[in-house]
Regions:
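Conserved N-terminal phosphate-binding loop of PLP-dependent enzymes in the Aspartate aminotransferase
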Residues: 1-394, 398-413
Length: 413
């Protein structure tokens, strides 16, 4: 299979990447320890040095690193807890169509009603505002600032504003540089921490290592997981020094010292030592952009929308049933893609950053053929508008509902 799902963004460098395999096998063969809680180990020190020297210092970024646990939601929970401690306030601002996780704190930030239907825990102390583009051409940052400036608006002064620069599960909605800069300015004006969730669209997925680089932001806290561990479980925070106000033992967890993730993560961060790697991602991004716009033009009467950047792209076909049918047709042809968006109406593409251009073109051709098969079939007849009754459980990897198995080595990278 060609995998354009990439473990929901965990496998940015492909399945069984040879650099990670070699590093892991060498480490294990030398009896390197797998787990050390939060104690110092050689592999942990080497990972920290790699991220500082290869990622942070070249970008003139000064952050402290906190390992929070194995998954992205652990990073979000730690960021919320720290922001509330630093600012001595409880309220948080999040955005429409946001997705930040399924534990109670991160779930409160998540916009999709479907994820809340079976969870009756507290969702207090979070307000959702319209994301960039949610109200068409209206600048939604104006509404946020208006309510913050008005002491009678009913909006408490928040400890933090949490956002994704590209909403992945929300439908590949890309915030503009101007909007992000205005949100950052609002944070500075009202003494609010800016937390960027770069769990899925960071780690090079947007074309730069951090998704916010293109607009010059310097968030107070950055949440990273998924690909940062080289395909192994890891989550961490990058924290501005003045916000690092934890006292010993205030935020702990058992699985914060996954040495196998340190080894794999360090090996794959080395891609970023070579500027050509980022240029190659930009070239592949243009290939995907051109292919999706060609598909949208071919079916212009359906008014489909193409959104994305780097190697995170979405084709909004306006209907969850249609998008799901395209995903399933592609799978049967050997291409793995998922769906996303409020109604699962977006076909989502996350090819590995390391994919060969020939494989990328092959996958895009499969997608085009699958769309032709579905549109010429019966699905298109019932999908002229967005179907609000779409079961959002399809947001998971579509292959999980099919009775198949495959070895990792069968997936091309």
């Amino acid at each position: 299979y060609l995998d354009f799902f990439a473990g929901a963004g965990t496998l940015n460098y492909g399945h069984n990447n040879p650099l990670a395999k070699e590093a892991l096998l060498s480490y294990i063969s030398k009896s390197g320890i797998s787990h050390a809680l939060d104690m110092a180990t050689t592999s942990k020190i080497e990972f920290i040095e790699e991220i500082q020297n290869t990622i942070l210092k070249p970008r003139q970024l000064d952050y402290r690193i906190q390992f929070t646990g194995p998954t992205g939601t652990n990073a979000i929970e730690a960021a919320l807890k720290l922001a509330r401690k630093v600012k001595q306030r409880s309220h948080i601002v999040a955005f429409t169509n946001a997705y930040h996780g399924h534990s109670l704190g991160s779930l409160a930030l998540t916009g999709n009603r479907y994820y809340h239907d079976e969870h009756y825990g507290s969702r207090n102390n979070v307000s959702h505002f319209p994301f960039d583009g949610y109200l068409g051409n209206f600048d939604t940052s104006i509404l946020l600032e208006k309510m913050l400036a008005d002491p009678s608006s009913g909006l408490p002064l928040p400890a933090a504003i949490v956002l994704e620069t590209i909403q992945g599960e929300g439908g590949i909605r890309v915030a503009t540089a101007g909007w992000l800069q205005r949100i950052a300015a609002i944070c500075r004006k009202y003494d609010i921490l800016l937390i960027i969730d770069d769990i899925q669209v960071g780690n090079g997925r947007s074309g730069c290592f951090f998704s916010f680089e293109f607009c010059g932001l310097q968030p107070d806290i950055i949440c990273l997981s998924k690909a940062i561990g080289g395909g192994m479980p890891m989550a961490l925070l990058l924290i501005r020094p003045e916000c690092d106000q934890w006292q010993p033992g205030q935020h702990t967890g058992t699985f914060r010292g996954n040495n196998l993730a340190f080894v794999a993560g360090k090996a794959l961060l080395e891609y970023w030592r070579n500027s050509q790697f980022q240029q190659d991602v930009a070239t592949k991004s243009n290939v995907v952009r051109s292919a999706l716009h060609a598909i949208a033009s071919e079916y212009a009467e359906h008014n489909w929308d193409v959104r994305g950047k780097g190697l995170v792209w979405g084709l909004d076909v306006g209907c969850g049933e249609l998008a799901s049918a395209i995903s399933k047709a592609a799978f049967h042809r050997g291409l793995i893609v998922e769906t996303c968006g409020a109604h699962d109406q977006v076909v989502k593409l996350l090819p590995p950053l390391t994919i060969l251009e020939s494989e990328l073109n092959q996958g895009l051709q499969i997608l085009s053929d699958s769309i032709e098969e579905v549109v010429l079939g019966t699905h298109a007849k019932s999908c002229s508008t967005v179907n609000p009754g779409v079961d959002a459980s399809n947001n998971a990897n579509v292959v999980t509902s099919l009775p198949i198995t495959f070895e990792a080595t069968q997936v091309l990278i």
